[in-house]
A protein has these predicted regions:
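Conserved catalytic-core segment of nucleotide-activated headgroup transferases in glycan assembly
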Residues: 59-152, 158
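Catalytic binding pocket for nucleotide-activated donors in carbohydrate/polymer assembly enzymes
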Residues: 160, 164, 168-225
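Short, charged, surface-exposed secondary-structure boundary motifs
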Residues: 3-5, 25-31, 43-49, 176, ...
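Repeat-solenoid scaffold signature
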Residues: 1-17, 21-25, 211-215, 219-221
Length: 225
């Protein structure tokens, strides 16, 4: 993230503060504070995971500057093509085996829906086939998995094809989730017990969408379907 932590290790300033860029403690004795918020890290939950003292913003830890203004809302994709679309445009490294198991069950329960993924390396047919097979093993049909290559700065446009986004866990989305909400697409998140697993919690709470915050994988599945 270009944070130049070796500089901070030399403590050039009497008080040093970290914010954003890295969703966890720096581990540096000379870093005195880390900016977070009361929803991402409620008092008493994560102090033991941080070498810094936590400065909790009263609402949300971040600001968001969209890359472009969205086109006028043209209706839900499901109403246009008759098929409900789940989507995830996070780094695919976040889509761990437990996430695939969870999403596979969601697709098993919604056989007419599809999952749209944006994956670096999607030009490799063997890699794409491997991803599809993982979801099939988890209960989905191969035809329910649509995989696109990374779209760089045009990623937000893909949300026009999505009805509901799925937040991975335990490493959930940050900017990707902000893009989703900006484009009018809500997402389901699983609340964890660390900052990196609760970014979705604070973003949904601060946009009035608490009903999309799940406390268990079973609840996550139920909210999605």
């Amino acid at each position: 993230a270009g944070g130049r932590l070796p500089v901070f290790a030399k403590q050039p300033a009497p008080v040093q503060v970290t914010w954003l860029g890295h969703p966890a403690t720096t581990g540096l004795p000379g870093m005195h504070w880390r900016i977070t918020d009361v929803h991402a890290e409620p008092p008493g939950m994560t102090e033991h995971l941080n070498t810094e003292r936590l400065y909790r913003m009263p609402e949300v830890f971040c600001c968001y500057q969209p890359s472009a203004s969205p086109d006028p809302f043209a209706g839900l994709p499901a109403d246009q093509d008759g098929r409900f679309t789940f989507g995830c445009f996070n780094n695919f490294a976040k889509v761990t085996p437990p996430v695939i198991a969870c999403w596979g069950e969601i697709l098993r329960q919604t056989p007419h829906a599809r999952l749209l993924l944006e994956v670096h390396g999607a030009q490799d047919a063997a890699f794409v086939q491997d991803i599809r097979q993982r979801f099939v093993t988890a209960g989905a049909q191969a035809t329910q998995i649509d995989i696109l290559p990374r779209q760089a700065n045009q990623q937000y446009v893909l949300y026009r094809q999505v009805d509901l986004a799925l937040d991975p866990f335990p490493c959930c989305g940050g900017t990707t989730s902000c893009d989703s909400l900006w484009m009018g697409v809500p997402f389901v998140t699983l609340a964890g017990r660390s900052f990196v697993s609760r970014m979705g919690v604070t973003l949904l709470h601060n946009t009035g969408l608490d009903e999309l915050i799940a406390d268990s994988e079973a609840q996550y599945i139920a909210k999605a379907v």
